[in-house]
């Protein structure tokens, strides 16, 4: 059995989106699981549409999610001489030919075919041309497709695909300026790179018969194909930017962890029993492209957030501090290591993303400027004021290094005053955080410390 070799081959005409990353992950997993090779190829032959920023963004996205490719990145724009040699070889062997049909002639032909309700296609008029070429026309090069032959391949997801060559026209492999076309360069590079398995979106399925024609014409070995169904939104429509089809790096800015995103995308179109959470090692052990679903998968923000929340909970304090560096939040330098641990232990249980975690840090560490109106209205000032004044005295005596002592101080007020828990907890929470919800009060007191806790209570009483 030959060494497995896969590739991911994006065009740098736009940023890497979520569907592209999923394809890259599938190729990466299959290669690495079989101790094979995984290559990154930048398909930049369309010089008019290429973007250096887009190419760099693809590489940046790979670095972020940790998809390591083998060897150097292959840029198609640096391989034009190789493509020219292959085109000339096909011309020399009478497997391709120059076509002098002008754009106007081709447009006129297509109009006639539309009127006759025929499929618009080239009519092979220059296929066996031996005469004098017309002046003023820069020819394209077309492949000479064998007539009335059956192209048959077994797609790893779609099953057997059969196409008669009569359904194909002699498509262009080199434009009039000499630049090669997409299907041609893809075939050349996949063959010369030794790609054994092509895993790509099923929007490429219609290209496959054309590429097989080229593989055969050039005596190249045909790889295995797996055409993955697209990702749909939750309404069953094509994924749009609003529903997740956005730049991969936007997910980092939104506070998603790479582990969660990889897990999420690997599960979009692939499954293993009822298991939802997979480490990279588990994915490498279990993934097989033959298990990919033949029907489209649905993007779910709810599922992504659920997975991200899971992975967020597994991060240590030091790991979270590193991950939070790109986000703006309150200074933490005044907190000791134990306070930091309590802050993150409490908040990561209530956060789905790093961005949300950063906001919740501010909610605890920034003293409230105003207080939640609907909670404030429910409080009886006559009862609340003496309770908080008495609690201040308890806090002055409490050991703020002992969370149990802080909890005891809270319950002492409740027991001595013979009041309901909520009757004291609500005003205390409002004084400390400015709102009616949040993490446990003993944690808040421990994290804020004695001076800040008392300061916030005094400020609340003044208001």
Curated annotation (Swiss-Prot):
Key word Aminoacyl-tRNA synthetase present = yes
Q: What are the UniProt keywords, alphabetically?
A: Aminoacyl-tRNA synthetase, ATP-binding, Cytoplasm, Ligase, Nucleotide-binding, Protein biosynthesis
The short sequence motif called 'HIGH' region sits at 10-20
Task: List the InterPro entries.
Answer: aa-tRNA-synth_I_cd-bd, aa-tRNA-synth_I_codon-bd_sub2, aa-tRNA-synth_I_CS, aa_tRNA-synth_I_cd-bd_sf, Glu-tRNA-ligase_bac/mito, Glu/Gln-tRNA-synth, Glu/Gln-tRNA-synth_Ib_cat-dom, GluQ/Sye
Q: Which GO terms describe its molecular function?
A: ATP binding; glutamate-tRNA ligase activity; tRNA binding; zinc ion binding
Looking up Pfam families in the UniProt record yields:
Anticodon_2, tRNA-synt_1c
Q: Which reaction does it catalyse?
A: tRNA(Glu) + L-glutamate + ATP = L-glutamyl-tRNA(Glu) + AMP + diphosphate
Q: Which GO terms describe its biological process?
A: glutamyl-tRNA aminoacylation
Q: Where in the cell is it found?
A: Cytoplasm
- What are the boundaries of the signal sequence? none
EC number(s) of the enzyme? Answer: 6.1.1.17
- UniProt key word Cytoplasm: yes
Q: Primary place of residence?
A: cytoplasm
CDD domains for this protein:
GluRS_core (cd00808)
What's the domain of life for this entry?
A: Bacteria
Q: Which GO terms describe its cellular component?
A: cytosol
**Tell me, how does this one assemble?**
Monomer.
Family to which this protein belongs: Belongs to the class-I aminoacyl-tRNA synthetase family. Glutamate--tRNA ligase type 1 subfamily.
Q: What does this protein do?
A: Catalyzes the attachment of glutamate to tRNA(Glu) in a two-step reaction: glutamate is first activated by ATP to form Glu-AMP and then transferred to the acceptor end of tRNA(Glu).
Q: What is this protein called?
A: Glutamate--tRNA ligase 2
Instruction: Tell me what gene encodes this.
Output: gltX2
């Amino acid at each position: 059995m030959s060494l497995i070799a896969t590739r991911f081959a994006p065009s740098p005409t736009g940023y890497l989106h979520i569907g592209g990353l999923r394809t890259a992950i599938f190729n990466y997993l299959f290669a690495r699981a079989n101790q094979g090779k995984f290559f990154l190829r930048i398909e930049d032959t369309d010089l008019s549409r290429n973007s250096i920023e887009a190419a760099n963004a693809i590489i940046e996205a790979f670095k972020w999610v940790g998809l390591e490719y083998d060897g150097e990145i292959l840029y198609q724009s640096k391989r034009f001489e190789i493509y020219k040699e292959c085109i000339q070889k096909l011309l020399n062997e009478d497997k391709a030919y120059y076509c002098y049909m002008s754009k106007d002639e081709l447009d006129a032909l297509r109009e006639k075919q539309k009127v006759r309700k025929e499929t618009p296609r080239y009519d092979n008029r220059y296929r066996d041309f031996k005469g004098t070429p017309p002046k003023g026309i820069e020819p394209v090069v077309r492949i000479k497709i064998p007539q009335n032959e059956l192209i048959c391949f077994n797609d790893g997801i779609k099953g057997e695909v059969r196409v008669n060559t009569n359904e194909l026209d002699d498509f262009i492999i080199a434009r009039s300026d000499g630049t090669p076309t997409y299907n041609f360069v893809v075939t050349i590079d996949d063959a010369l790179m030794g790609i054994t398995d092509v895993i790509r979106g099923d929007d490429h399925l219609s290209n496959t018969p054309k590429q097989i024609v080229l593989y055969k014409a050039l005596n190249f070995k045909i790889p295995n194909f797996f055409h993955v169904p697209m990702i749909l939104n939750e309404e069953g429509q094509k994924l749009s930017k609003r529903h997740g089809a956005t730049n991969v790096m936007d997910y980092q800015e939104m506070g998603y962890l790479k582990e969660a995103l990889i897990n999420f995308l690997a599960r979009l179109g692939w499954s293993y029993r009822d298991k939802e959470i997979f480490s990279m090692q588990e994915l490498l052990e279990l993934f097989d492209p033959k298990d990919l679903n033949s029907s489209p998968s649905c993007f779910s923000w709810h599922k992504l957030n659920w997975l991200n929340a899971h992975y967020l909970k597994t991060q240590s304090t030091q790991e979270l501090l590193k991950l939070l560096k790109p986000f703006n939040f309150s200074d933490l330098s005044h907190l000791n290591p134990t306070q930091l641990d309590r802050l993150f232990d409490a908040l990561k249980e209530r956060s789905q993303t790093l961005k949300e975690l950063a906001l919740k840090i501010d909610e605890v560490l920034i003293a409230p400027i105003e207080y939640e109106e609907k909670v404030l209205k429910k409080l009886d000032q006559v009862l609340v004021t003496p309770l908080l004044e008495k609690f201040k005295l308890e806090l002055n005596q409490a050991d703020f290094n002992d969370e149990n002592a802080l909890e005891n101080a809270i319950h002492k007020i409740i027991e001595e005053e013979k009041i309901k828990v909520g009757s004291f907890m609500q005003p205390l929470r409002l004084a400390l955080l400015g709102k009616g919800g949040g993490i446990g009060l003993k944690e808040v007191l421990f994290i804020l410390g004695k001076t800040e806790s008392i300061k916030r209570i005094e400020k609340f009483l003044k208001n």
